[in-house]
Amino acid sequence: MQDADTQTTIFGNTVAELVGENLRIGIVQARFNAALTDRLAQACLVELELLGVSAKHIEHVSVPGALEIPIALQAMARRKDFDALIALGCIIRGETYHFELVSNESGAGVTRVSLDHATPIANAILTVENEDQAWARVDDKGRDAARVAVEMVNLMEELS
């Protein structure tokens, strides 16, 4: 049993200490809703640094929108240069069916890349009803994405 000083809490659950040292992380950020995704990325990058991930081990690229995230993740995963990947985007409901299409397809694409390449991907593509909901979530979800990526790498190492 670990003592409380070596544990952290994610999503209300206590987990082993997250160790990001020497990890290589790839980040794909959608530029659509750029003010929001920039803030999401900023929170994610700060948290990765706090977890011990070196800035020189982070590759951060941008794509036009959420639907382009999976193919960029796939290109990164194929290179096998990364321990984990992070998807950052923000989809805000509009008046048409497009919200469901973009939300469902981008989410499914992220999952498929993760499974096809056995690479942990933290999915922080926000799907919200309005801009206020997005602003209320960007900092927490950016930090969570960093933590999820590091936790999943640590777990995958334990399981292999």
Curated annotation (Swiss-Prot):
It is an enzyme of class 2 (transferase). Pfam families: DMRL_synthase. Keywords: Riboflavin biosynthesis, Transferase. One of its GO terms (biological process) is riboflavin biosynthetic process. 5-amino-6-(D-ribitylamino)uracil binds at residues 32, 66-68, 90-92, 123. Belongs to the DMRL synthase family. This is 6,7-dimethyl-8-ribityllumazine synthase. It comes from Methylibium petroleiphilum (strain ATCC BAA-1232 / LMG 22953 / PM1).
